[in-house]
From Swiss-Prot:
It comes from Salmonella paratyphi A (strain AKU_12601). Keywords: Cytoplasm, Hydrolase, Serine esterase. This is Acetyl esterase. GO terms for molecular function: carboxylic ester hydrolase activity. InterPro entries: AB_hydrolase_3 (IPR013094), AB_hydrolase_fold (IPR029058), Acetyl_esterase (IPR023508), GDXG_lipolytic_enzyme (IPR050300), Lipase_GDXG_put_SER_AS (IPR033140). One of its GO terms (cellular component) is cytoplasm. Its main location: cytoplasm. The gene is aes. Its EC number is 3.1.1.-. It is found in: Cytoplasm. Belongs to the 'GDXG' lipolytic enzyme family. Pfam families: Abhydrolase_3. The lineage of its organism: Bacteria, Pseudomonadati, Pseudomonadota, Gammaproteobacteria, Enterobacterales.
Length: 323
């Protein structure tokens, strides 16, 4: 689709979202478009420091967890001494960027709003690690904490997964992997999904939205996919194209959040409609006037904080509901 035919979303954003788009961090250099992946990762970490400031303080603990691929770093956020559940968080970044520090504020707020221990998983990034390594690392982390719950003062009878963007795909894929492989790490009471991609190769929203402002042009999405997958056949895998998995049974309750002007919004809509059609518990909410990745900007956008609180409320309600 010619770029000229796309919807001019920058003129339709909320005032708060426009303020974020136009915000210039003092001393921040331009995005290193021609830099190697490691340079881009360091820039992303630097750029996110401002957005992660002034986060709630709480007890944190870093733990290296053994997996079949080597140790994976995790960070435990404990807002109180005891927790009614454990929530595993997978960060976004197109499978190629991000770490526990780039999403620190999101995880701290989620821990505060749920009152539960949140465990961030610093899964291996692509292209150095290819599908399904990040999922298998996540499953290994869940298994480890299930077996060492007392050591870390965790309640793993009730667990959940959460993630944003690529992390949302990993969150849902990991939960389905546990179900499909009959791996028991606790009762998955909910999955919290913010503006994820779930396997669509094309859609109306991918044609109408996406540009330099969000890093989600058609070329960008193809690049992320090629970095993550081993080969073309992986595109149809039921843990990458999640619409090729069985979504008619035993899907944990899903909170599905989307951004109004996100090229990936149709992934969220289709996921919600599919689950709803098969009586799988789910809730869908679209946040008006927003772009992809708006969850990061809670320092300037109350709607980002609202989206986190909405997911937290969904999770807490499922803590009280026996499954």
């Amino acid at each position: 689709m010619k770029p000229e035919n796309k919807i001019p979303v920058l003129t339709r954003l909320s005032d708060k979202m426009k303020a974020v788009v136009n915000f210039q961090q003092p001393g921040l250099p331009p995005w290193p478009a021609d830099g190697d992946i490691e340079t881009q990762r360091q820039y992303y970490l630097l750029e996110r420091r401002f957005w992660n400031a002034d986060a709630p303080s709480m007890t944190t603990r870093t733990c290296a967890v053994p997996t079949p691929y080597g140790d994976v770093t995790t960070r435990l956020y404990s807002p109180q001494p005891t927790s009614q559940a454990t929530l595993y968080y997978l960060h976004g970044g197109g499978f190629i960027l991000g770490n526990l520090d780039t999403h620190d504020r999101i995880m701290r707020l989620l821990a505060r709003y749920t009152g539960c221990t949140v465990i961030g998983i610093d899964y291996s990034l692509s292209p150095q690690a290819r599908y399904p390594q990040a999922i298998e690392e996540t499953v290994a982390v869940c298994s480890y904490f299930s077996q060492h719950a007392d050591e870390y003062s965790l309640n793993v009878e009730k667990i959940g997964f959460a993630g944003d963007s690529a992390g949302a795909m990993l969150a849902l894929a990991s939960a389905l992997w546990l179900r499909d492989k009959h791996i028991r790490c606790g009762n998955v009471i909910a999955i919290l999904l913010w503006y994820g991609l779930y396997g669509l190769q094309d859609s109306v929203s991918r044609r109408l939205f996406g540009g330099a402002w969000d890093g989600l042009t058609r070329e960008d999405l193809d690049m992320y996919e090629k970095a993550y997958l081993r080969n073309d056949e992986d595109r149809e895998s039921p843990w990458y194209c999640l619409f090729n998995n069985d979504l008619t049974r035993d899907v944990p309750p899903c909170f599905i959040a989307s951004a109004e002007f996100d090229p990936l919004i149709d992934d969220s809509r289709l996921l919600h409609q599919t689950l709803q059609a098969h009586q799988q518990p789910c809730e869908y909410k679209m946040y008006p006037g927003t772009l992809h990745a708006f969850l990061h900007y809670s320092r300037m956008m109350t709607i980002a904080d609202d989206a986190l609180q909405d997911g937290a409320r969904f999770f807490m309600a499922r803590m009280k509901t026996p499954r």
